[in-house]
């Protein structure tokens, strides 16, 4: 792409054409994977049921004003379940795609192995207000979402520019509705079966949910660990017990 210089056919004296180059880009993979949807919804029902009970029990110990609000603004968050045998096919699929994502990005994984550090399901409260403020997952290499229940009426993920220098010096955009090189955030409107994979360093958030229709998704984080480290015994087990 040629940039700069004069927009007229006749080039003025001293005209220079610049060629555009693009570096330090942030990749986001989006695909539809409906083949796991039915079984995964059924599998995660029990995890959401348990998460609802845990949250209900927790609210019993909260101040009265929190009890009165109830679950508004909260979400039902499960424990990690990547080792559940019934999730095996989905976990393997996500692991393989995450490896391909890093490989495609240019990283040499010959001496690394990938490990799930977190793999959980969550559902926003049916009373509405469920959301995530902007955050990133520290010390992770791949993060992702798999959407189980969602619609045009539910929350959605928003991704933010991960470059601090860019954010600190941001200028006004000519068109806020158009994605350009100056865009500081983008969002996706998923549908059931949508899968999104992105670098673990990318800040993201979830828009406030209205509580009109169910919103449930799986979220995972993966770390690439040097093979020499992952094969060693944990140093924690070698330390003298107090």
PLM segments and residue spans:
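Non-heme Fe(II)/2-oxoglutarate
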Residues: 2-108, 238
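A structural signal for short, well-ordered beta-strand segments
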Residues: 119-121, 144-146, 218-222
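Short, cationic low-complexity segments
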Residues: 56, 164-171, 239-242
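Short, solvent-exposed loop/turn segments at secondary-structure junctions
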Residues: 36, 151, 164-165, 202-204, ...
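Catalytic core of Fe(II)/2-oxoglutarate
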Residues: 177-242
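Short edge beta-strand segments in beta-sheet-rich domains
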Residues: 26, 116, 213-217
